[in-house]
Amino acid sequence: MKDSDQKTNNEELAAIAQRLKELRKAKGYSNYEHIAFALEMSRSAYWRLETGANFELKTLIKICRLLEVSLEEFFKDIKIPASKNEKP
């Protein structure tokens, strides 16, 4: 993976992490420990999500269900550019 691709991936993960944090607070979970408990996750596992760790889609779906947010709503303000790869 090119350095520029890695930078883009990190920026996208950071945007997703920020969105998680915003939605958590908007839904009344004052800190990450409370939502981690509700999700039956360890505090450290959830904390990694809010700090930009890569994670599985099924984890995001579980979080969205708890927060009563659709995936479409979750991603609405997150810009993920299309691939720049050329077709052969």
Question: What name fits each language-model region?
Answer:
Residues 20, 31-32, 57-60:
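Helix-turn-helix DNA-binding elements, focusing on the entry/boundary residues of the two helices
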Residues 1-27:
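A short, Lys/Arg-rich alpha-helix, primarily the initiator
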Residues 24, 36, 64:
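The alpha-helix within a helix-turn-helix
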Residues 49-50, 67, 75-78:
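DNA major-groove recognition helix of helix-turn-helix
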Residues 20, 35, 46-49, 74:
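Conserved hydrophobic/aromatic packing and binding residues within compact polymer-binding modules
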Residues 1-11, 75-88:
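Short, charged recognition helix plus adjacent turn
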Residues 28-47:
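Short alpha-helical DNA-recognition segment
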